[in-house]
Swiss-Prot record:
The active site is at 304 (proton acceptor). Keywords: Cobalamin biosynthesis, Glycosyltransferase, Plasmid, Transferase. This is Nicotinate-nucleotide--dimethylbenzimidazole phosphoribosyltransferase. HAMAP family: CobT.
Length: 335
């Protein structure tokens, strides 16, 4: 963030042909974009979303309404262009990349797929560590690699998406661990489990959290209770942060990955924009911890990066605010 550019952009904002604060929160977004890009008139072009996919051993606890094979089936759907994220990305001028870091089963070669499978799904986090520290490191590097590709191919703003049956359980455990919250605050219904499924999710998260001990680093915590795609998402955002890009958050699992990235690099928070507020109850706690206001509140609970991609045109519009004429430039009298 460039404080001098922020001040210059604020001065220009106060002179634009509109009443003060008439564009509300979008004005703050515009100022942040200007400071991030180091220019008073920010420009946002094509976006990119990297959908990180992996399976979860914790599905053995009965925490999901869908069977594990849906993860692989949905990845194939992404590659064929048939998912919600594909359709929203077409509308939002956003490229879609898919990253396999732990899907059970083989996937075909595809130009939009980066195969970096660390292992075929995590171990059951309710019974023991989800992965080894070395596996967590590999997942992190895979996310970084996918982000580098997206940036090299022209992304000017970057989002992550997620796919993994059982991943709201892992996201809840990771969020609770990183923010010091009880399971009840962060465990939601995910894909739509009933009361018994919700109880099992809370128990699984509680058992995972009980194994943690003081002094563990963020990546150690993620290896114990997280998911391969959640760690990869942290890598995606870390790489985007180091490249200086605006970073758009999706829902609960993606924001869990972003929390991990933030714990590893606190300066990353200045680059984050909350695309939306998810239906998952833990998402509000995540955004509050990051100090972020969501751009959209549409009762979404799909994942895939959909909420982040829906917000991209809004971010582009916010950037254009500072391209408006000032009262002096337009020859308009001030009130």
């Amino acid at each position: 963030m460039d404080p001098e550019v922020f001040a210059q952009a604020r001065l220009r904002m106060d002179q634009l042909t509109k009443p003060p604060r008439a564009l509300g929160y979008l004005e703050e977004v515009a100022l942040r974009l200007a400071a991030l890009q180091g220019r008073v008139k920010p420009e946002l072009g094509r976006g990119a979303v990297v959908v990180a996919a992996a399976d979860h051993g914790v599905v053995a606890e009965g925490v999901s309404a869908y069977p594990q094979e849906v993860t692989r089936q949905m990845v194939l759907n992404f590659l064929r262009g048939g998912a919600a994220i594909n359709q929203f990305a077409l509308a939002a001028d956003c490229a879609v990349y898919v990253l396999d870091v732990g899907v059970v089963g083989e996937l075909p070669d595809h130009p939009g797929l980066l195969k970096r499978k660390v292992r075929p799904g995590t171990a059951n986090l309710a019974q023991g560590p989800a992965m080894t520290p070395e596996e967590a490191e590999r997942a992190l590097l895979a996310g970084r690699e996918a982000a580098r590709r997206a940036i090299a191919e022209g992304a000017t703003l970057l989002a992550a998406g997620d796919m993994g049956i059982g991943n709201t359980t892992a996201a809840a455990a990771l969020t609770a661990a990183l923010l010091g919250l009880p399971p009840e605050a962060v465990v939601g219904r995910g894909t739509g489990v009933g009361e018994e499924g919700l109880r099992r999710k809370r128990q699984a998260v509680a058992r995972a959290l009980a194994r943690l001990h003081p002094g563990m680093g963020p990546l150690e915590v993620a290896a114990e209770v997280g998911g391969l795609e959640l760690v990869a998402i942290a890598g995606i955002y870390l790489e985007g942060y180091e490249a200086g890009l605006p970073l758009v958050l999706d829902g609960f699992p993606v924001t869990a990955g972003a929390l991990l990235a933030w714990k590893m690099a606190p300066g990353l928070r200045d680059h984050l924009f909350a695309g939306h507020l998810s239906r998952e109850p833990g998402h509000r706690h995540q955004l509050e911890a990051l100090g972020l206001r969501p751009l959209l509140d549409l009762d979404l609970a799909l994942g895939e990066g959909t909420g982040a991609v829906l917000a991209m045109p809004l971010l582009r519009a916010a950037a254009r605010i500072l391209h408006m004429a000032t009262f002096q430039e337009a020859g308009v009298s001030r009130g």
